[in-house]
Protein backbone atom coordinates (compact mmCIF):
# COMPACT_ATOMS: atom_id res chain seq x y z
CA UNK A 1 0.00 0.00 0.00
CA UNK A 2 1.40 3.38 -1.03
CA UNK A 3 2.24 6.05 1.54
CA UNK A 4 3.03 9.77 1.67
CA UNK A 5 6.48 10.46 3.13
CA UNK A 6 7.87 13.78 4.29
CA UNK A 7 11.63 13.85 4.77
CA UNK A 8 12.70 17.17 6.18
CA UNK A 9 15.99 18.70 7.23
CA UNK A 10 17.74 22.03 7.53
CA UNK A 11 19.85 23.57 4.78
CA UNK A 12 22.84 21.42 3.79
CA UNK A 13 21.48 18.23 5.37
CA UNK A 14 21.66 16.25 2.12
CA UNK A 15 18.00 16.31 1.06
CA UNK A 16 18.73 16.71 -2.66
CA UNK A 17 21.40 13.99 -2.72
CA UNK A 18 18.94 11.70 -0.91
CA UNK A 19 16.20 12.29 -3.50
CA UNK A 20 18.67 11.59 -6.33
CA UNK A 21 19.80 8.41 -4.55
CA UNK A 22 16.21 7.17 -4.18
CA UNK A 23 15.54 7.88 -7.88
CA UNK A 24 18.69 5.98 -8.86
CA UNK A 25 17.73 2.96 -6.75
CA UNK A 26 14.27 2.71 -8.35
CA UNK A 27 15.57 3.22 -11.88
CA UNK A 28 18.40 0.72 -11.44
CA UNK A 29 15.65 -1.88 -10.97
CA UNK A 30 13.82 -0.73 -14.11
CA UNK A 31 11.15 1.14 -12.14
CA UNK A 32 10.51 4.65 -13.51
CA UNK A 33 9.98 7.58 -11.16
CA UNK A 34 8.77 11.14 -11.60
CA UNK A 35 10.95 13.94 -10.24
CA UNK A 36 9.29 17.24 -9.32
CA UNK A 37 10.72 20.45 -7.91
CA UNK A 38 9.50 23.93 -7.13
CA UNK A 39 9.39 26.49 -9.91
CA UNK A 40 10.62 29.00 -7.30
CA UNK A 41 14.03 27.35 -6.87
CA UNK A 42 16.25 28.97 -9.47
CA UNK A 43 19.61 28.67 -7.64
CA UNK A 44 20.99 26.33 -10.30
CA UNK A 45 18.36 26.36 -13.03
CA UNK A 46 14.56 26.09 -12.94
CA UNK A 47 13.46 22.49 -13.44
CA UNK A 48 16.54 20.79 -11.98
CA UNK A 49 17.31 19.03 -8.71
CA UNK A 50 20.93 19.78 -7.84
CA UNK A 51 23.07 18.61 -4.94
CA UNK A 52 26.02 20.46 -3.43
CA UNK A 53 28.33 17.61 -4.52
CA UNK A 54 27.57 18.30 -8.17
CA UNK A 55 24.90 15.73 -9.07
CA UNK A 56 21.84 17.05 -10.87
CA UNK A 57 18.75 15.74 -12.64
CA UNK A 58 16.01 17.32 -14.70
CA UNK A 59 12.69 17.58 -12.86
CA UNK A 60 9.24 18.87 -13.73
CA UNK A 61 8.87 22.37 -12.19
CA UNK A 62 5.67 22.85 -10.21
CA UNK A 63 4.02 26.06 -9.08
CA UNK A 64 1.04 27.16 -7.02
CA UNK A 65 -1.27 26.59 -9.98
CA UNK A 66 0.04 23.13 -10.95
CA UNK A 67 -2.48 20.30 -10.73
CA UNK A 68 -0.01 17.64 -9.63
CA UNK A 69 -2.67 14.93 -9.47
CA UNK A 70 -3.70 15.41 -13.12
CA UNK A 71 -0.06 15.62 -14.22
CA UNK A 72 0.77 12.25 -12.60
CA UNK A 73 -2.54 10.63 -13.62
CA UNK A 74 -1.78 11.40 -17.30
CA UNK A 75 1.62 9.66 -17.26
CA UNK A 76 1.74 6.25 -18.92
CA UNK A 77 3.07 3.87 -17.86
CA UNK A 78 2.47 4.80 -14.25
CA UNK A 79 5.57 5.73 -12.24
CA UNK A 80 6.58 3.53 -9.33
CA UNK A 81 7.22 6.58 -7.15
CA UNK A 82 6.84 10.37 -7.18
CA UNK A 83 9.77 12.32 -5.69
CA UNK A 84 9.52 16.03 -4.84
CA UNK A 85 12.36 18.38 -3.92
CA UNK A 86 11.89 21.78 -2.23
CA UNK A 87 8.53 20.61 -0.86
CA UNK A 88 8.36 23.50 1.61
CA UNK A 89 7.25 25.69 -1.31
CA UNK A 90 4.15 23.57 -2.02
CA UNK A 91 0.70 25.01 -1.37
CA UNK A 92 -2.05 23.37 0.63
CA UNK A 93 -3.70 22.35 -2.66
CA UNK A 94 -0.42 20.84 -3.93
CA UNK A 95 -0.08 18.72 -0.77
CA UNK A 96 -3.70 17.57 -1.04
CA UNK A 97 -2.89 16.50 -4.63
CA UNK A 98 -0.01 14.41 -3.26
CA UNK A 99 -2.32 12.71 -0.77
CA UNK A 100 -4.75 11.92 -3.60
CA UNK A 101 -1.91 10.42 -5.69
CA UNK A 102 -1.16 8.06 -2.80
CA UNK A 103 -4.77 7.23 -1.93
CA UNK A 104 -6.40 7.12 -5.39
CA UNK A 105 -3.54 6.10 -7.70
CA UNK A 106 -1.71 3.93 -5.12
CA UNK A 107 1.66 5.52 -5.97
CA UNK A 108 4.12 6.28 -3.14
CA UNK A 109 5.09 9.94 -2.84
CA UNK A 110 8.28 11.13 -1.13
CA UNK A 111 8.53 14.86 -0.44
CA UNK A 112 11.82 16.41 0.67
CA UNK A 113 12.20 19.91 2.07
CA UNK A 114 12.75 22.33 4.90
CA UNK A 115 10.38 22.23 7.86
CA UNK A 116 10.80 25.77 9.16
CA UNK A 117 11.97 29.09 7.75
CA UNK A 118 14.61 31.51 9.06
CA UNK A 119 12.03 33.03 11.47
CA UNK A 120 11.34 29.53 12.80
CA UNK A 121 7.83 29.39 11.30
CA UNK A 122 6.54 26.44 9.31
CA UNK A 123 6.41 26.80 5.55
CA UNK A 124 2.92 26.22 4.09
CA UNK A 125 3.97 23.06 2.26
CA UNK A 126 5.73 21.68 5.32
CA UNK A 127 2.73 22.40 7.56
CA UNK A 128 0.38 20.37 5.39
CA UNK A 129 2.92 17.60 4.82
CA UNK A 130 3.30 17.28 8.61
CA UNK A 131 -0.50 17.03 8.88
CA UNK A 132 -1.11 14.58 6.01
CA UNK A 133 2.00 12.40 5.73
CA UNK A 134 1.94 8.75 6.71
CA UNK A 135 5.65 8.78 7.56
CA UNK A 136 7.72 11.75 8.72
CA UNK A 137 11.50 11.41 8.83
CA UNK A 138 14.21 13.90 9.77
CA UNK A 139 17.40 14.13 7.70
CA UNK A 140 19.97 15.30 10.22
CA UNK A 141 23.01 17.53 10.05
CA UNK A 142 25.08 19.40 12.61
CA UNK A 143 25.15 23.04 13.68
CA UNK A 144 27.53 25.34 11.82
CA UNK A 145 28.97 26.51 15.18
CA UNK A 146 29.00 23.38 17.37
CA UNK A 147 28.34 19.63 17.27
CA UNK A 148 24.67 19.75 18.24
CA UNK A 149 21.97 18.72 15.81
CA UNK A 150 20.96 21.59 13.53
CA UNK A 151 17.22 22.21 13.70
CA UNK A 152 16.95 25.80 12.49
CA UNK A 153 18.10 28.01 9.64
CA UNK A 154 19.84 31.33 10.23
CA UNK A 155 19.53 33.88 7.42
CA UNK A 156 22.63 35.99 6.91
CA UNK A 157 22.97 39.37 5.20
CA UNK A 158 26.36 41.09 5.07
CA UNK A 159 27.66 38.80 7.82
CA UNK A 160 24.80 39.59 10.21
CA UNK A 161 21.91 37.33 11.29
CA UNK A 162 18.48 38.43 10.07
CA UNK A 163 15.25 37.51 11.87
CA UNK A 164 12.71 39.59 9.91
CA UNK A 165 11.76 39.87 6.26
CA UNK A 166 9.98 37.96 3.53
CA UNK A 167 9.68 34.22 4.11
CA UNK A 168 10.87 33.10 0.69
CA UNK A 169 14.25 34.39 -0.42
CA UNK A 170 15.97 31.85 -2.62
CA UNK A 171 19.57 31.34 -1.60
CA UNK A 172 22.19 28.84 -0.58
CA UNK A 173 25.53 28.99 1.21
CA UNK A 174 25.76 32.74 0.85
CA UNK A 175 22.46 33.38 2.64
CA UNK A 176 21.69 30.58 5.09
CA UNK A 177 23.45 28.64 7.84
CA UNK A 178 22.05 25.55 9.61
CA UNK A 179 22.23 25.94 13.37
CA UNK A 180 21.03 24.43 16.65
CA UNK A 181 18.43 26.25 18.78
CA UNK A 182 21.09 27.79 21.05
CA UNK A 183 22.99 29.33 18.15
CA UNK A 184 19.82 30.49 16.40
CA UNK A 185 19.00 32.60 19.45
CA UNK A 186 22.63 33.57 20.12
CA UNK A 187 24.98 33.11 17.16
CA UNK A 188 28.61 33.69 18.23
CA UNK A 189 29.30 37.14 16.74
CA UNK A 190 33.03 36.58 16.41
CA UNK A 191 32.45 33.45 14.33
CA UNK A 192 29.72 34.61 11.95
CA UNK A 193 30.96 33.84 8.47
CA UNK A 194 29.08 32.43 5.48
CA UNK A 195 29.79 28.86 4.46
CA UNK A 196 32.53 28.41 1.89
CA UNK A 197 31.51 28.17 -1.75
CA UNK A 198 32.62 24.98 -3.51
Curated annotation (Swiss-Prot):
Its main location: cytoplasm. GO terms for molecular function: ATP binding; thymidine kinase activity; zinc ion binding. GO terms for biological process: DNA biosynthetic process; thymidine metabolic process. It catalyses: thymidine + ATP = dTMP + ADP + H(+). One of its GO terms (cellular component) is cytosol. Keywords: ATP-binding, Cytoplasm, DNA synthesis, Kinase, Metal-binding, Nucleotide-binding, Transferase, Zinc. It is an enzyme of class 2 (transferase). It is found in: Cytoplasm. SUPFAM superfamilies: Glucocorticoid receptor-like (DNA-binding domain), P-loop containing nucleoside triphosphate hydrolases. The active site is at residue 86. Its EC number is 2.7.1.21. Zn(2+) binds at residues 143, 146, 180, 183. Pfam families: TK. ATP binds at residues 9-16, 85-88. InterPro entries: P-loop_NTPase, Thymidine_kinase, Thymidine_kinase_CS. PANTHER family: THYMIDINE KINASE (PTHR11441), THYMIDINE KINASE, CYTOSOLIC (PTHR11441:SF0). Belongs to the thymidine kinase family. Homotetramer. This is Thymidine kinase. It comes from Streptococcus thermophilus (strain ATCC BAA-250 / LMG 18311). The gene is tdk.
Amino acid sequence: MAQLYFRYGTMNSGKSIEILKVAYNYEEQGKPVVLLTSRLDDRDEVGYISSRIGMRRKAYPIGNDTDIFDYIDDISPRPYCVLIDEAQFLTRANVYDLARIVDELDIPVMAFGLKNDFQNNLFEGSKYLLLLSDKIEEIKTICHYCSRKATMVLRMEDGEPVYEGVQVQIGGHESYISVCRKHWFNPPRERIVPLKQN
